[in-house]
Amino acid sequence: PSMEPAAEMEISGRGHGEHKLLHAAELLVDPRIDYLDMSLWDVFKDVHDAAFAGEPLLKVFTDLPRKGVALGAAGKLYSAKACEAAIASGLDFVLVGRAAVVHADFPRQALTNANFEMQALPVTRDHLAAQGLGPKFIDYMATWDGFVAA
């Protein structure tokens, strides 16, 4: 599908990150797409590409035109307030990874307690087991620096 001319003009000539941004822009106006979820590693970091210097990475994507395509992202969303800030920045939904591993009920906790935060890392193997993680997954998580206490 072709993009609207206005969307093309907004992102043309922006250098190195243009290809990925152009692809996201095309998806956000594609009537076959219900939602686009992005793993940004840190939804609040600034863009490293010189063409977008000083802009929050999230803003680069939330400013793109959307035609009924919901936009979500993951990346260091470790508290209810961080999730709320990401939504306020223009996302339609958020995805939690590590926070949901550390707290299987993170979404419920975040919705009912605006001050809820993920427990500080590292966490114990017992804590992860209590969240429903199996021994093999806990062993895998132990390979992540600073995630599982020795």
PLM feature segments, named:
Residues 1-150:
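Flavin-dependent oxidoreductase catalytic cores
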